[in-house]
Regions:
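Conserved phosphate/anionic-ligand binding catalytic regions in large, soluble enzymes, centered on
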Residues: 142-159
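Alpha-helical support elements that line or immediately flank enzyme active sites
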Residues: 159-165
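Long, Pro/Ser/Thr-rich low-complexity/intrinsically disordered regulatory tracts in eukaryotic proteins
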Residues: 1-140, 155, 167-169, 174-176, ...
Length: 330
């Protein structure tokens, strides 16, 4: 699959220690037991030195939000800063969220289409932890989790895809139906509700019960390949039937992003999508990787950290414009 359509691959495993109650958010002593037990298991496996332990209560709000923007932690984890923590691998490829809805959410992310590698990284951590501890498991149901939809393998496999032309041609309704037929879900990554800012979507399995890990990965991969092919077909069509319009949209986006002095959140995502499309189609002397770096660094919390102060309103939009110009000028 082409990684210029697929931004990233993620696999996440939900695990719970057999002797601890499920909801630890209101149980600080047992939540601490979960953290220390996980650290100890990594130490026994010789993996502790590869990870940094970050307790949310010791972090600023903006630092927590920056981790969410980087997809290292979930928004749900941020709800319980007093008890939640995360172990982040030094290269940021693996994170172990502790004391969210489940005791552990083991997550691995890879650039482009690489679900198998992400899964292998998760299972490496899972094996290390399970050698020292017993996880909640039922012979018929599989791994037991806080939410029944996560029971079974406890695995969520997902791909992030940039689908601007499928969106503009109003095919996402049909895409949603196609995805649902094979037990997957599709949603916009940025924005609220049905909104998909930047035309970035996530596809993932809806249920984990009754299917093996390999079956889940294969299904998500197959749908990702299908969507990639559909988007690429529209790219080829655009180059033959709407080349001047496509080039105009791409060059306008490049002009705005390299010259704007104020860049609101919504406008940035629109321009980013056109810029990424141009990079994907070879219409700009920019790599897709550079464009995606701009996406990461233009997020609100990242901008505040870069500026060294809390920003809001027009000051935040001005900082976004400055940072984007800086990155695209490198």
């Amino acid at each position: 699959m082409q990684s210029d359509i697929v931004l990233s691959s993620r696999v996440r495993l939900a695990r719970n220690y057999a002797d601890l109650p499920f909801d630890l958010a209101s149980e600080p002593e047992q939540a601490e037991t979960c953290i220390l037990r996980t650290l100890s298991a990594l130490r026994q496996a010789g993996l502790e030195e590869q990870y940094d332990l970050l307790r949310l209560r010791d972090m600023s709000d903006v630092s927590r939000r920056a981790m969410e923007e980087s997809h290292l932690v979930s928004r749900d984890l941020l709800r319980s800063p007093e008890t939640a923590a995360v172990l982040v691998k030094r290269d940021s490829s693996v994170s172990i969220m502790m004391n969210e809805d489940d005791h552990l959410r083991i997550q691995a992310v890879r650039t482009g289409d690489d679900l198998l590698s992400a899964a292998q990284a998760c299972f490496c951590v899972d094996d290390a932890l399970s050698r020292q501890n017993e996880f909640a498991f039922d012979q018929q149901l599989g791994y037991l989790t806080a939410f029944p939809t996560n029971a079974g393998t406890g695995m969520r496999a997902s791909l992030l895809l940039h689908l601007p032309l499928l969106t503009r041609s109003k095919q996402m309704g049909n895409v949603g139906q196609m995805v649902a037929k094979v037990g997957l879900n599709i949603r916009g990554v940025y924005g609220e509700g049905a909104e998909a800012l930047g035309n970035i979507y996530q596809i993932s399995n809806q249920v984990t019960l009754g299917r093996t890990e390999q079956e889940l990965i294969t299904t998500v991969e197959a749908v990702g390949q299908r969507l990639t092919m559909m988007e690429q077909n529209l790219e080829e069509k655009a180059l033959t039937t709407a080349k001047i319009e496509t080039e105009d949209a791409v060059q306008r986006a490049f002009g705005i992003l390299t010259h704007a002095r104020i860049l609101p959140h919504g406008e940035f995502y629109q321009m980013y999508s056109n810029l990424r499309l141009g990079a994907t189609m070879g219409l700009l002397p920019l790599s897709v990787q550079k464009v995606d770096e701009v996406l990461d660094q233009a997020q609100d919390a990242h901008l505040c950290i870069y500026a060294g102060e809390t920003l809001s309103g027009q000051a935040l939009d001005a900082a976004r414009a400055d940072r984007v110009r800086e990155l695209l000028g490198e």
